Amino acid sequence: MMDTWEHLFLTGEFPARADLLSGLTLEQVSLVPGGASHSIYEELWHAAGYQRSIIERDQAAGEHYPSAAPKHEQQWHDLVQQFLEGAQAAVAWAQAPDRLAIEVEPGVTMADELHSVAVHNAYHLGKIVALRQRIGAWPPKATTDES
């Protein structure tokens, strides 16, 4: 039986997160297509920051979108790696039931927070797919048979 947390954070319901974020150039992740409010880079930056704010309890992690597009492709690759490592950390966190029961604020457990991150990630990954479609970069080459 598939682990629920692994399913939520890494593999479930749409292409693997690494595949979904693969094959993009610096130019593509920096584009803000007409009618869109953010670039792919900004969407992932926000999702990674929110994820980190919950996993690491770092309240400042996801406060503001970056003011400029990344200048170097390595910034994009680093952000993807940070996001994927954060998702792995969420899965690891969830493997201990006693940790899930920790109350992080009155009436809110760590399990509640992790569910929130999973839903938040799904929302922003969906926006990234929509942006990729708008700029002609979907499906990723790694998942061309899974649209």
Predicted regions mapped to residue ranges:
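Acidic/histidine-rich alpha-helical segments that form the ligand environment
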Residues: 71-105, 112-119
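Short, contiguous alpha-helical
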Residues: 2, 6-21, 26-68, 105-147
